Structures are given as structure tokens and as C-alpha cells.
Amino acid sequence: VDINNGESVFTANCSACHAGGNNVIMPEKTLKKDALEENEMNNIKSITYQVTNGKNAMPAFGGRLSETDIEDVANFVISQSQKGW
């Protein structure tokens, strides 16, 4: 797991909608610790699945990012949520 790579992947692919752990499209579904817990997204498996397959307005990144990049970005999101972004 490479958190620095995860940060780079996040900045390039996720930050347009999720800058600072927020959510521009659905403001109640942020990447903050409490929201991740409430939505049962506070684990690598759930985040990896959603990044890979997309959901609602969120596009699937499975065809655009490698499995390694997706795993790294999931670890970055969990790490940042625990730090409070």
C-alpha cells in the first residue's frame, strides 16, 4: 500500500467532487469518518468496490485505474478520514 500514490490518484481523479473529503454532488455523503461509518463505507473493501464500480452519480473507475491505484486511493481515504481531513 502506497498512501502517497493514493493521494496522487485522489488529487487527479477524485478531488473535483471530493476535495477535502466533501461531496459536491451529494453533500450528506462525504468521506468524513462519521459519514463513512454511517454509510458502512469505512473499510477498504467497500471503498474499493465503489471506486471500481461506481454508484449513482459517481462514475466507475475500474476501467481507468489499476487495482493497485484503487487500493491505494481507498487506503488514502481511510487514512484521511481518521485524521479529520
UniProtKB/Swiss-Prot annotation:
Gene3D superfamilies: Cytochrome c-like domain. Heme c binds at residues 14, 17-18, 58. It is found in: Plastid, Chloroplast thylakoid lumen. Keywords: Chloroplast, Electron transport, Heme, Iron, Metal-binding, Photosynthesis, Plastid, Thylakoid, Transport. Binds 1 heme c group covalently per subunit. Monomer. This is Cytochrome c6. It comes from Petalonia fascia. The gene is petJ.
